[in-house]
Each structure stands twice: as C-alpha cells, then as structure tokens.
Amino acid sequence: MWNDARTINLIANTLAVLAVAAMLLAGVAWVAQRPYFTLAAIEIESMPETEMHYVSTGAVRAAIAGRFGGNFFTVDLDEAREAFESVPWVRHATVRRIWPNTLRVRVEEQQPLALWNENQMINTWGEAFTANTGELADDMVLPHFTGPEGTESLVVQRYAELARWFAPLDMHVRELVLNPRYAWAVTLSNGMKLDLGRDPGADAPDPHGLPGALPFAARIQRFVQAWPVVSSRLEGRTVTQADLRYPTGFALALAPLPPEHASHSKSKPAKKR
C-alpha cells in the first residue's frame, strides 16, 4: 500500500484537510471567546403595533440578571427566551442576535381581563398568569372569575357571551363563578346574583362553543327578554337574586322593604315567571 502513490497522496490530502479544519475550528473558537463578542447590550421593545404598560426595561433586566450566560455566539436563545417569559407581565418573547454583541428582545405583554381565583389574573387569550395587581391602573376595575384549573378559556368565552347578552339591559358581569360541579353563578353590576345552573358545554371545554350549551343560553336569554316587563312591576323593590334553573321560568328573591314601608306593605314572596 505504501508503494502506491495514489493511496499515499489520498491519505496525505485527507490529513491536510483535517489539519486545516482543526486549525479553522480552533481559530473560530479562539475568536468567539474574545471580549469583543461578550454581550454588551440587551434591547427590549414591544411587539409591532403594541405598547408596554406594565413591563419596564429596568425591571426586565433586573429579573433576568444571571439567568443565562454566553456571548454572541454561544448564548442559548431558547434559554434566554424562557428567562424573559418568566418575567411578570410578559406573555411571550422573541430573542435574536444583533451583530456583534447585542440581543434584541421583543415582548408581548399580558392583557389582563379579570382576576382569577385567589391570586392570579386571566388574560384576553383565556390564560392564567401571575403578576402584581397593585400595578394595575387606578381606574381599572377588573371582574373576578372563579373556576376549576383548566377552565380558563371556557370561562372567558362564557364571560364574552354574558357581556353581549346583558348589554341591552345596561348591566355587566362583576363576578363569574364556575363551581366544581360545572354550574355557573353570576353577580351583575347592580348587585343582583344569578344562579344559572349547569352548562352542558362546560363538560367538554371548547373555546369555539358547543351546540350542547344551547339550553344554558336559552335560560339566560329568557331572563333578559322578560326582565324589562318584570322590573317594571317590582314597585321599586330591589332584586337580590334570580334563580334561572327552572325549566319554564325563573324565581326572584327581593330585598326587604325599608322600615318606613314595612308597616304599610307586606313583604312579597319570591316571584316566579
């Protein structure tokens, strides 16, 4: 074999190529470790066509300090993205390299829709998140949602439907509860509490709705349609609670008469439609 010139040339050429490749790799590794490529800046900006109301660049930098390492070449972008997305009020982040020593981060901020259970909020995408409610604007009053874990999207969907149904009555939802039995209760802006009963659509949460939820919707629409006539016959009495679970109507609980009227009028029993 060693007398074969072609074989010897092939081996020599192969060794030469490997040697050059090793030298190139060593050179690249040496250059990559130069201080020139140490990350010197992190640019933080909002996603296109959005604004940041709760996320400050200073708070983000403080929160991610020491969370990931490396230089322009070696930084793990997925690890960096996860670090940024762990910052309160950050829903999603994208991270890219900007030559020669900068990371550019685009942040999508959480859009709070309601308070969720004990100590979380829920966003407009139907996702639960944790952040400081004390950072909300002073004039922002959020409704309060309660429900089992994993029902966030369903609760947001039902909230949107309820808001649409009660809008003609100049009422909005102040509190929405989905209990472990998947029955709903609502408190409206006028303080009236509604027992809505079980929602067939809640047994299989679907952000696009299910035909099985029709009976649930029908109960509410029946109440909304009847309310203008019913309220006109209450003689100024306040309804504290409405039970919509009856198959052919609903029952009302009335607040007690003021003391000055109690002697002139008997308390009326709950009405049923």
UniProtKB/Swiss-Prot annotation:
Residues 32-273 are periplasmic. The keyword Transmembrane applies. One of its GO terms (cellular component) is plasma membrane. Residues 37-110 form the POTRA domain. It is a single-pass type II membrane protein. Keywords: Cell cycle, Cell division, Cell inner membrane, Cell membrane, Membrane, Transmembrane, Transmembrane helix. One of its GO terms (biological process) is cell septum assembly. The chain crosses the membrane at residues 11-31. Essential cell division protein. May link together the upstream cell division proteins, which are predominantly cytoplasmic, with the downstream cell division proteins, which are predominantly periplasmic. May control correct divisome assembly. PANTHER family: CELL DIVISION PROTEIN FTSQ (PTHR35851:SF1). Part of a complex composed of FtsB, FtsL and FtsQ. Belongs to the FtsQ/DivIB family. FtsQ subfamily. This is Cell division protein FtsQ. It comes from Bordetella pertussis (strain Tohama I / ATCC BAA-589 / NCTC 13251). The gene is ftsQ.
